[in-house]
Amino acid sequence: MREIVTITASHRANHLITQFFNGQERALHERDEQAGSDPSVFLHGTIDADGRTMSYEPRAVLWDAKGGSGALGRFQYWSQDDYADEEEPPRAAPGIEVVQTAARVRRSAYQRALDAGEAPPALTAAGARYWSDYGRMIYGQDSVQELAHWHHDVAAPSAPDFEALGQRRFDRYENGYEVFTEECARDFFDISLHRQLEQCDTLQGFNLVTETDNGWGGFMAALQEQLREEVPKVCYFGWGLNVDESGPRHPPRAGFQRQSNKLRATLAMLEQSDLYFPIRSEAADSLWEAGGWACHVLDSVNSAMCLEKSRTLRFMNQLADRLHSGDEQRNVVSLMSSGQRSYSYFADAPRHRSSRGDPHTFSRCRLLRGSHSPPETTLSVENLELIRTYAWRPADTIPETARNLHHIDLGVTEKCRDVFKNWYEMVAKQFRYDPDREELKERLGTLGAAYECGWYSDDDSGDDT
């Protein structure tokens, strides 16, 4: 087998991965004989007691803040002691006082329908505040993990609240790095990861999905750094979720902190990943809607890794080799687009003052979903490799506006140079007292040069700051 384990960190990332696994659940029932997917790549199957059916659970570990899983109990569906219907008040033995420490979260109408074996209602943003409100698969007993001291805030789901006191937020890269290293690493490696690896025969790699704007980026950076040491000989795809900066403005100090978080998390993840995908999300979209759109890319990339019959591609490292195009240092996928929209945060970055003309494309490929053929005009694009995979099967949880998808274009372009050069200047001008300032400048300068096509003079580089 060619198993892929997915690890997510943050409420936004869990919305995305819920949409992805809902699609995997649908694929179990609608497999295409000619270009079908192998469910064992992303799902662990066990034979039921009757010996005639199989049950599947995602090969995944999900991290969230305390209470971030909503109405889903950690051992719900595994132990009745962990389940309480929201219509029933807590029961206690005589003489025992029940203390409620957080507001009770009721199951969504969608989940109540699934649990009752009924047809679920259509989803709306209001009915999908938590990723567990519309999850169609049951996760393993150790797959859903929560931070011990940082509580989920419905009003600010990307900024967990320390002990729910309203005084400290999980909004700094350093916070996340420290929390994983000191509080979460041991249980993750000894319990959650160990269980996932035990269920794999031939692990091909990991998908690591997180936000970059807040403490979760540091959390995933620490996790990936240690994971790469623990499991070194597999492929790593990093997925960084970035909220569009053109959305609601933040106070100057908060805006700078978000940029600092984004810079550090992106550098940490891309240096530990074989391919890094900087995903852009509209600030106006709900997490449910943003997850539905981002699933276009996540599902398309991973669909190429689980084909039962493929003449072109079967493994993560094969896609990485195609996009590296001979230079493993160029591992940022800055082109991600379909006929509907661009999904890349890097693609919308402002041009650096030294940039010349349109950015050069080093490599690109098109993932065709099913039998749909692209227009002839796009087939003439130079160096465009076509990779055909199975048809896009959107789950009923994908927003209606995001259910059409024929292809996804991926590419490594010179646009990365703009990002790294702009970040270089930001570090040089604003990171005056950071102890790692010179190290960051060196790393950004090296990365910027790796994505240059042609000759740039020293005056063009902007590296004299």
From Swiss-Prot:
One of its GO terms (cellular component) is cytoplasm. The keyword Phosphoprotein does not apply. Pfam families: Misat_Tub_SegII (PF10644), Tubulin_3 (PF14881). Keywords: Mitochondrion. It is found in: Mitochondrion. GO terms for biological process: mitochondrial genome maintenance; mitochondrion organization; plasmid maintenance. InterPro entries: DML1/Misato, DML1/Misato_tubulin, Misato_II_tubulin-like, Tubulin/FtsZ_GTPase_sf. PANTHER family: MITOCHONDRIAL DISTRIBUTION REGULATOR MISATO, PROTEIN MISATO HOMOLOG 1. Belongs to the misato family. Involved in the partitioning of the mitochondrial organelle and mitochondrial DNA (mtDNA) inheritance. This is Protein DML1. It comes from Eremothecium gossypii (strain ATCC 10895 / CBS 109.51 / FGSC 9923 / NRRL Y-1056). The gene is DML1.
